[in-house]
From Swiss-Prot:
Enzyme Commission number, as recorded: 5.1.1.3
Keyword Cell wall biogenesis/degradation (UniProt): yes
Record: residues binding substrate: 7-8, 39-40, 71-72, 183-184
Enzyme class: isomerase
Organism: Bacillus subtilis (strain 168)
Pfam families according to UniProt: Asp_Glu_race
Role of this protein: Provides the (R)-glutamate required for cell wall biosynthesis.
PANTHER family: GLUTAMATE RACEMASE
Protein name as it appears in the record: Glutamate racemase 2
Top-level taxon in the UniProt lineage: Bacteria
UniProt catalytic activity: L-glutamate = D-glutamate
Active-site residues, record numbering mapped to chain: 70 (proton donor/acceptor), 182 (proton donor/acceptor)
Any one of the GO BP annotations: peptidoglycan biosynthetic process
Length: 265
């Protein structure tokens, strides 16, 4: 049985990238809802409908677990999904808690970057309210980064220009940690680093989600003996065009490059 991964677009590849590291012998289905991306700028009701359509499709593929590799979809629908399906469902949320713990010690601020919909969600506000006792957290929606990623446009000059414009009213020196609260954003780690400096920490929930997936499968005695294959679907349509598949797999190379540059520091 395979593991299903779902995202509004290609952002979930950043989570799949981490999952393959800890679970190399599983087989995966990656479902990108490219017909309806971006989710972060749409109504909650519409997005929930898209999410359930994707989950129904993945359930029909006889998966053993589902990873909602999208912060927006997790915040909107994970509880409802768990009530409706009998396989384990693992989500991803902005990694605010470790960021606050670290920045409290260092007397620095935390910047959470995400989509509009994630930042508006009550679930996110409750999470921040519960743990941000020193008013350290600032938030910024960066929908343009989702568009860059979905267009496979990783031109650093364009991205830095966009980020500089969006961050023009922020004092960048006051931040100790950037929380990448959208799964599309780890593709742009190097651009964030060029603006904030190499000392700033960048945290996403991807690693924790991958570890949680492994734990859930181990607890259920469902760890696989597969080959690490990935089958790609765009909004329910299987991708057979090798050129498109190569574009998807090239995303792993981009993530390799961002990780190498961070190891270098």
């Amino acid at each position: 049985m395979k593991i299903g991964f779902f995202d509004s677009g290609i952002g979930g590849m950043t989570v799949l990238y981490e999952a393959i590291k800890v679970l190399p012998y599983e087989d995966y289905i990656f479902y990108a809802d490219t017909l309806n991306v971006p989710y972060g700028e749409k109504s909650k009701g519409k997005v929930k409908e898209y999410i359930f359509n994707a989950a129904e499709f993945l359930a029909s593929q006889n998966i053993k677990a589902l990873v909602i590799a999208c912060n927006t979809a997790t915040s909107i629908a994970i509880e409802d999904l768990r009530r409706n399906f009998d396989f384990p469902i693992i989500g991803i949320e902005p990694a605010v808690k470790p960021a606050i713990n670290k920045c409290t010690e260092e007397r620095k601020r935390v910047l959470v970057v995400a989509t509009n919909l994630t930042l508006k969600e009550e679930k996110f506000h409750n999470l921040v309210k519960e743990i941000d006792h020193h008013d350290l957290v600032d938030c910024l929606a960066l929908p343009g980064l989702v568009e860059f990623a979905e267009n496979f446009d990783f031109s650093e000059d364009k991205i830095i220009k966009y980020l500089k414009n969006e961050l023009s009213s922020f004092d960048l020196k006051q931040y100790g940690t950037i929380v990448l609260g959208c799964t599309h954003f780890p593709f742009f780690k190097n651009s964030f680093e060029k603006l904030f400096g190499i000392k700033v920490d960048m945290i996403s929930g991807s690693v924790g989600t991958a570890k949680q997936l492994k734990k859930v499968l181990a607890d259920r005695n469902q760890l696989g003996k597969g080959s690490g294959s990935i089958t790609f679907f765009n909004s329910g349509h299987k991708i057979v065009d090798q050129e498109v598949i190569s574009k998807y797999k090239r995303l792993f190379e981009i993530l390799d490059e961002t990780q190498r540059s961070h190891v270098g520091h």
